[in-house]
Amino acid sequence: MRCFKATIAYDGAYFLGYAKQPNKLGVQDKIEDALNALGIKSVVIAAGRTDKGVHANNQVLSFHAPKHWNAAKLFYYLAPKLAPHIVLKKLEEKNFHARFDAQKRAYRYLLTKNLKTPFLAPYIACGDYGSLDALNTALKQFTGKHDFSMFKKEGGATTNPKRTIFNAFAYKTFIIGHECVVFKIIGDAFLRSSVRLIIQACVQYSLEKITLAEIQAQIHNLKATIRTPIMANGLYLHRVYY
């Protein structure tokens, strides 16, 4: 068997998350079904398991295929079976583990105050976010190594809630005629819905609905003020570092 590394992008609006689902509406279901149609039976491992509605620009996968498959041939037959909602960007033969070999994951979140067309609604979140300075003040609280037990939803297989965030900041830009705030958070790994809970906390602070002290109390697992993640549609798994 040969091990392959695949880099894909997908539209999370069409899936119930990355992981396999009973109704087969997970990204993993679609990819494994496409491989099965080519006679390849393999579990597909992802660098990160995104939630329902979350997108990916550069998700990384690892899987195995029989030796008669090379990267060029497999790309040719696999890419059309994944389209249009999953795009196979790159495929190479590489002996590695997509999840355990990853060193860092980078997420981006797109948020605008005024969405001018419904056609962008699945891809840019809409809502007030206060001031950019306040957002960045809140984001700085999360850098470093922390126990994120109070910044995760129930579920997930991990038993270690400690994660390191290397960088977290926000900036403004224009995306398809919309002024947006883009949040960028880079960490070694993330717990379930952790990124969206972090961004929700920062937005609520910027809107003066919670204080920095309340954010710090939740980071230190003293009291949970933010329990509901921000909407999923603005979130993208942007890059995985190896």
Curated annotation (Swiss-Prot):
Q: What class of enzyme is it?
A: isomerase
Q: Identify the residues that bind substrate.
A: Y107
Read off the SUPFAM superfamilies from this record: Pseudouridine synthase
**One GO term (biological process):** tRNA pseudouridine synthesis
Q: In the UniProt record, does the keyword tRNA processing occur?
A: yes
What the entry lists under Pfam families is as follows: PseudoU_synth_1 (PF01416)
- Please list the residues that make up the active site: D51 (nucleophile)
Give one GO term, molecular function aspect: RNA binding
Its Enzyme Commission number?
5.4.99.12
Report whether Chaperone shows up as a keyword of the record: no
- Family per UniProt? Belongs to the tRNA pseudouridine synthase TruA family.
**Role description:** Formation of pseudouridine at positions 38, 39 and 40 in the anticodon stem and loop of transfer RNAs.
Recorded catalytic activity of this chain's protein:
uridine(38/39/40) in tRNA = pseudouridine(38/39/40) in tRNA
* Name of the protein this chain belongs to: tRNA pseudouridine synthase A
Q: How does it assemble?
A: Homodimer.
Per UniProt, the keywords (alphabetical) are: Isomerase, tRNA processing
